[in-house]
């Protein structure tokens, strides 16, 4: 820190300082410096949310003090939805800490500062601290949680939820990063542990936790009474059960209840200023007054527009927000510093700090000496120079760049470590640098050298989806759903039931078959059951118990599977035998190309890129599928592969399904390769015949490096001089003939296929190695999940949704999939929302006209596009963040997911409205589809969809058409299992036999209760999921894992659960030995061997001779044992010991 500062800080209330000449990251360095100087908290007021987020990242780079944001609700004033639970949690946590904040920076956007907040007394009065060893009755705690607004659920997933199971209580407190598990011993807290939401496993112990209320207002009985009486004083009461008053009276909180927050308190809501400690210093950047006035005008306009709904009468704006004049009179009560970029006139309260813009230092990739500008600046600047990069990965890239002009910067953590004429490097989020003329120091950020960098991904602490847990999981079975039993065929699930057989209670899965026949499957045999997935549920077959239709279908499928496996191996062998081209990787050129990518790559994206590059550098032909949700950056993977190909003087073909997409790829590729001597052309209906002929001639001569086009590229008159890479986008949109053409190219050209249609992981396992798969499941920077609503059509809902979007400067897709009446629909919208500028786009328009419409929409010349599903693939418009789909019940799930992916391509909250007719006018299937899509708000949910959407589009297509037939008869999961077994057998050089494929599963029956009691795991779906996992476990380790997880999540194992795991272990042993059946009872039991087994006959004969009173043969494959096993514990022990002896004497 320099000894003398260039400015003094205001101390008294109302005293102001204006500091000028702050450019680039100088604002952030200055706020950091103020935070270190000022003996109290600093509140930084930003003009809007975007600036607040950027400043948070930048300031954190320059100080070790705490830097916090007060989250904004991110809803419109008087909105009909509530903020996300995570936002409320973060706000409560910040508000709770604020009054006692000693030092540090709190950043608040103006409109959040204007919003009134809950009284401080409420937060402190309702916070509860729980410690290990504390005496606390569980019932009292549950009552307390209920009255604090926590929701009781079966499994804790979100903030504000709790679950109880026996002596355990799971709880996700507001303001906490992770949920906690409390273990009670009587009425004492025995242990407090943090656990992971996804796996539900505990992580570590803690001593105490702090419990904040679940909302920013009380929800206990007294508060609801107060709400009711204040409502009656303010508005009239409607009898309608949908009315806000009636809903709150019943104890349910309707969406958007936050805008009636004042009615829950007896005194008016205070401003945020009431939370600031007395020694707070305010700092503001940007034009406060304009931002505040704009916000006030918006609020007023919405109050007037929305105040007409008798079901939702509104409170006046002043009870929820400060007026602009109130805001400024509050500001006068505090010392305040204003930061300005311009030079200020000389006055006592003003100081100019002498920060100046850097000269233009951009790297000129196409020049001979790309780093000339930077080199000259460094030679002439005689103070320290600090380079700032965003991450370790970028640090290496910058290091390589600087090495070319012989500069090796030294790593520092703080700006004031820079001295003399040193060259330094620090990691942080600063966007633009500056020259500090007073300290004679220059800060150069990455974007000063490489052009605009766009926000890197703020690590979202929200959960990521683990696709494996979604697939083949029985946890979501509903009664009436089709399931496959390996031995009896496709039936319908009819629920779980407990039956008593021979005095032993067991839990069974009940299935119904044709003619109402029932089959009870013991839970130990759940490995024989899988969900039926292979087509629409209503088309699933229903087999007859004991009939031979199933065994015939299974036999046929197994034969088919064998052929498929052979075909796959054949393609693979051909690829392995044919030498592809091994590309050379010129790292320096490639790095320069990567540096001009304005986003930080996500971890999955980086993995996909590395996989593709290493495939291309192998002599084998590449065949890789990159699968990622819409807009997760698959195109960049393709561009880098194309760059490597062109750098090796090879040509690249990019094949896309539609002309619009071709145009978009063409524009993107042209932009991305703008600084490189690469020639890119496009072949599509937009080109005249003459242009096309010209292009084809140049392709054949090798003058064109990258050719983009629709299926025209596959015509026989397209000849490449030296094609090295074929990139196929959305392969499933091409017809069979086109696919055959692509298949023919496979063996000797590197092929990269991009798709957003999710392909289940299981498919990849079965194809192990046929086609390599990369999955991109992390969303790029600041993409929020798309909020999805399923609503009956209502013109007010439509008007609201369109206004919400256009008021924040965005655009709307209005999907109307009926070309005949699309004109009428557009006219109806124009009447409903006169503020909107509307255009129409559909597939039957003349191609050029459609192109013009899309282009205008892209350039924001109008803000509502009424269109058909033409927008389904790939058109990328970041400012379009609302999609409204009329008659959403007419779409398939995968299609709805694709369409929803058109929005939410920036860091604004995106909305998808699925409008439907009256529920009675929809099929149940359509209702289920809409429920499924609404439940999968998370980004990257494409994979989950593959399981929900049992249409599994990818499956039939990967292998050619006739496949999907056999898949429909036996179901997807079983089909995949058969295919996996067949591929393994063929790889090992064995001919796969049906026995091999539908291998006989061992039965173990010891006549003792073996189940997960429902008082141990009350939720039937969770129980079912565990049964399936136990039955399907292949190794002892897997069972051990499951056991640890059960104890961890539900407490000590009851005896029947222990027995269930023991029997599963015995089944694994018996299966390995080739034992078909193992029965035990009080007097002994029977072991039945399969024809092919690993039991040593000599050892067995010896046993029969030595102990004839205990063992005897009963037919050629049955061994009887006579033993007193009336004690259940000894029964398991004895059988386990006998199995061990069999294992020790097994033969190969």
Curated annotation (Swiss-Prot):
Residues 615-776 form the Helicase ATP-binding domain. The keyword ATP-binding applies. CDD domains: DEXHc_TRCF (cd17991), SF2_C_TRCF (cd18810). Couples transcription and DNA repair by recognizing RNA polymerase (RNAP) stalled at DNA lesions. Mediates ATP-dependent release of RNAP and its truncated transcript from the DNA, and recruitment of nucleotide excision repair machinery to the damaged site. Can also dissociate RNAP that is blocked by low concentration of nucleoside triphosphates or by physical obstruction, such as bound proteins. In addition, can rescue arrested complexes by promoting forward translocation. Has ATPase activity, which is required for removal of stalled RNAP, but seems to lack helicase activity. Residues 798-951 form the Helicase C-terminal domain. It comes from Escherichia coli (strain K12). In the N-terminal section; belongs to the UvrB family. In the C-terminal section; belongs to the helicase family. RecG subfamily. The gene is mfd. It is found in: Cytoplasm. It comes from the Bacteria. This is Transcription-repair-coupling factor. One of its GO terms (biological process) is DNA damage response. Consists of a compact arrangement of structured domains linked by long, flexible linkers. The N-terminal region interacts with UvrA, the central region interacts with RNAP, and the C-terminal DNA translocase region possesses ATPase activity. Activity is regulated by a conformational switch from a dormant closed state to an active open state upon substrate binding. It is an enzyme of class 3 (hydrolase). ATP binds at residues 628-635. GO terms for molecular function: ATP binding; damaged DNA binding; DNA binding; DNA translocase activity; hydrolase activity; RNA polymerase core enzyme binding. Its EC number is 3.6.4.-. Keywords: ATP-binding, Cytoplasm, DNA damage, DNA repair, DNA-binding, Helicase, Hydrolase, Nucleotide-binding. Monomer. Interacts with UvrA and RNAP. InterPro entries: CarD-like/TRCF_RID, CarD-like/TRCF_RID_sf, DEAD/DEAH_box_helicase_dom, Helicase_ATP-bd, Helicase_C-like, Mfd, MFD_D3, P-loop_NTPase. Pfam families: CarD_TRCF_RID (PF02559), DEAD (PF00270), Helicase_C (PF00271), MFD_D3 (PF21132), TRCF (PF03461), UvrB_inter (PF17757). SMART domains: CarD_TRCF, DEXDc, HELICc, TRCF. A motif (DEEH box) lies at residues 729-732. Its main location: cytoplasm. One of its GO terms (cellular component) is cytosol.
């Amino acid at each position: 820190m320099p000894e003398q500062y260039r400015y003094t800080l205001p101390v008294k209330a109302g005293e102001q300082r204006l500091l000028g000449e702050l450019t680039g990251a100088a604002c952030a360095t200055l706020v950091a410096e103020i935070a270190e100087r000022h003996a109290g908290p600093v509140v930084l007021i930003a003009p809007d949310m975007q600036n607040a987020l950027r400043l948070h990242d930048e300031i954190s780079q320059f100080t070790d003090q705490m830097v916090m944001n007060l989250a904004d609700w991110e809803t419109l004033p008087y909105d009909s939805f509530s903020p996300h639970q995570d936002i409320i949690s973060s706000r409560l946590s910040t508000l709770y800490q604020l009054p006692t904040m000693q030092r540090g920076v709190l950043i608040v956007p103006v409109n959040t500062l204007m919003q009134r907040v809950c009284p401080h007394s409420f937060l402190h009065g309702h916070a509860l601290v729980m410690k290990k060893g504390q005496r606390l009755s569980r019932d009292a705690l549950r009552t307390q949680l209920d009255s604090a607004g926590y929701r009781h659920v079966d499994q804790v997933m979100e903030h504000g939820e709790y679950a109880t199971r026996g002596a355990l209580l799971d709880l996700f407190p507001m303001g906490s990063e992770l949920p906690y598990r409390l273990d009670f011993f009587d009425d004492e807290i025995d242990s407090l542990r943090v656990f992971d939401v996804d796996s539900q496993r505990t992580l570590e112990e803690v001593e105490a936790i702090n419990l904040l209320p679940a909302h920013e207002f009380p929800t206990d009985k007294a508060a609801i009474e107060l709400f009711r009486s204040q409502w009656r004083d303010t508005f009239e009461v409607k009898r309608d059960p949908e009315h806000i008053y009636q809903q709150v009276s019943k104890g349910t909180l309707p969406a958007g209840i936050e805008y009636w927050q004042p009615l829950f308190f007896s005194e008016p809501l205070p401003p945020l200023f009431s939370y600031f400690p007395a020694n707070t210093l305010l700092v503001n950047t940007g034009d406060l007054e304009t931002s505040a006035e704009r916000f006030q005008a918006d609020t007023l306009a919405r109050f007037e527009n929305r105040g007409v709904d008798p079901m939702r009468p509104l409170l006046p704006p002043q009870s929820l927000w400060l007026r602009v004049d109130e805001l400024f009179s509050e500001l006068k009560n505090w010392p305040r510093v204003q930061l300005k970029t311009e030079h200020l006139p000389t006055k006592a309260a003003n100081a100019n700090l002498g920060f100046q813009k850097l000269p233009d230092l951009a790297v000129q990739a196409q020049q001979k000496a790309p780093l000339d500008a930077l080199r000259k600046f460094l030679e002439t600047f005689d103070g320290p120079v600090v380079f700032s990069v965003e991450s370790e990965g970028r640090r290496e890239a910058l290091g390589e760049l600087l090495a070319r002009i012989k500069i090796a910067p030294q790593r520092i953590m703080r700006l004031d470590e820079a001295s003399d004429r040193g060259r330094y490097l620090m990691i942080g989020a600063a966007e633009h640098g500056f020259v500090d003329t007073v300290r004679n120091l220059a800060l150069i950020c990455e974007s000063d050298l490489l052009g605009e960098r766009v926000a890197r991904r703020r690590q979202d602490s929200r959960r990521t989806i683990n696709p494996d847990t979604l697939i083949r999981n029985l946890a979501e079975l509903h009664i009436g759903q089709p399931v496959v039993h390996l031995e009896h065929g496709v039936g319908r699930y009819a629920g779980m039931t407990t039956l008593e057989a021979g005095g032993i209670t067991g839990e069974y899965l009940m299935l119904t078959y044709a003619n109402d026949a029932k089959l009870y499957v013991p839970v130990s045999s759940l490995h024989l059951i899988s969900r039926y997935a292979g087509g629409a549920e209503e088309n699933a077959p229903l087999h007859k118990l004991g009939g031979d239709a199933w065994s015939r279908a299974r036999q046929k499928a197994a034969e088919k599977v064998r052929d498929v496996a052979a075909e796959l191996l054949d393609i693979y062998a051909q690829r392995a035998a044919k030498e592809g081209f091994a590309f050379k990787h010129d790292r320096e050129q490639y790095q320069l190309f990567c540096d001009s990518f304005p986003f930080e790559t996500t971890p999955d994206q980086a993995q996909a890129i590395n996989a593709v590059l290493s495939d291309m550098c192998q002599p084998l032909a590449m065949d890789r599928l990159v699968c990622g949700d819409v807009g997760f950056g698959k195109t960049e993977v393709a561009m880098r592969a194309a760059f490597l190909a062109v750098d090796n003087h090879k040509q690249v073909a990019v094949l896309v399904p539609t002309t619009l997409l071709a145009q978009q790829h063409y524009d993107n590729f042209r932009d991305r390769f703008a600084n490189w001597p690469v020639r890119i052309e496009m072949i599509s209906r937009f080109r005249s015949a003459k242009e096309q002929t010209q292009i084809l001639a140049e392709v054949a001569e090798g003058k064109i490096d990258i050719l983009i086009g629709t299926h025209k590229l596959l015509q026989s008159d397209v000849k490449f001089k030296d094609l090295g890479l074929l990139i196929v986008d959305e392969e499933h949109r091409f017809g069979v003939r086109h696919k055959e053409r692509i298949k023919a190219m496979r063996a000797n050209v590197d092929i990269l296929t991009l798709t957003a249609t999710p392909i289940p992981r299981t498919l990849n396992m079965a194809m192990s190695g046929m086609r390599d798969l990369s999955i991109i499941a992390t969303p790029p920077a600041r993409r929020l999940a798309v909020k999805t609503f399923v609503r009956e059509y209502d013109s007010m809902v439509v008007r609201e949704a369109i206004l919400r979007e256009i008021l924040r400067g965005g655009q709307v897709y209005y999907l109307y999939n009926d070309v005949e009446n699309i004109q009428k629909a557009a006219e109806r919208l124009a009447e409903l929302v006169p503020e909107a500028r509307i255009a129409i786009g559909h597939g039957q328009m003349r191609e050029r006209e459609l192109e013009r419409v899309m282009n205008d929409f892209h350039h924001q010349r109008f803000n509502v596009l009424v269109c058909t599903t033409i927008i389904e693939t790939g058109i990328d418009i970041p400012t379009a963040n609302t999609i409204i789909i009329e008659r959403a019940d007419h779409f398939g799930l995968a299609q709805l997911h694709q369409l929803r992916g058109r929005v939410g391509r920036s860091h604004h909250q995106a909305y998808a409205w699925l409008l439907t007719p009256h529920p009675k006018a929809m099929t149940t299937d359509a209702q289920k589809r809409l429920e499924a899509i609404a439940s999968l708000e998370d980004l990257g949910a494409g994979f989950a969809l593959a399981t929900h959407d049992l249409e599994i589009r990818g499956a039939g297509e990967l292998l050619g058409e006739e496949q999907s037939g056999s898949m429909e008869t036996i179901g997807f999961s079983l089909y995949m299992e058969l295919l996996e077994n067949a591929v393994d057998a063929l790889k090992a050089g064995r001919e796969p036999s049906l026995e091999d494929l539908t291998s006989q599963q061992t039965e173990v029956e010891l006549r003792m209760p073996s189940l997960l009691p429902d008082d141990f795991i009350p939720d039937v779906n969770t129980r079912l999921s565990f049964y399936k996992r136990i039955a399907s476990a292949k190794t002892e380790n897997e069972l051990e894992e499951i056991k640890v997880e059960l104890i961890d999540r539900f407490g000590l194992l009851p005896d029947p659960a222990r027995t269930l795991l023991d029997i599963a272990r015995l089944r694994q042993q018996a299966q390995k030995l080739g034992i078909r059946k193992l029965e035990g009872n009080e007097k002994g039991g029977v072991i039945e061997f399969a024809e092919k087994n690993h039991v040593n006959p000599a050892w067995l004969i010896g046993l029969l001779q030595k102990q004839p009173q205990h063992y005897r043969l009963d037919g050629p494959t049955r061994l009887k044992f006579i033993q007193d096993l009336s004690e259940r514990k000894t029964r398991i022990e004895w059988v386990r010991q006998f199995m061990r002896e069999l294992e020790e004497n097994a033969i190969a």
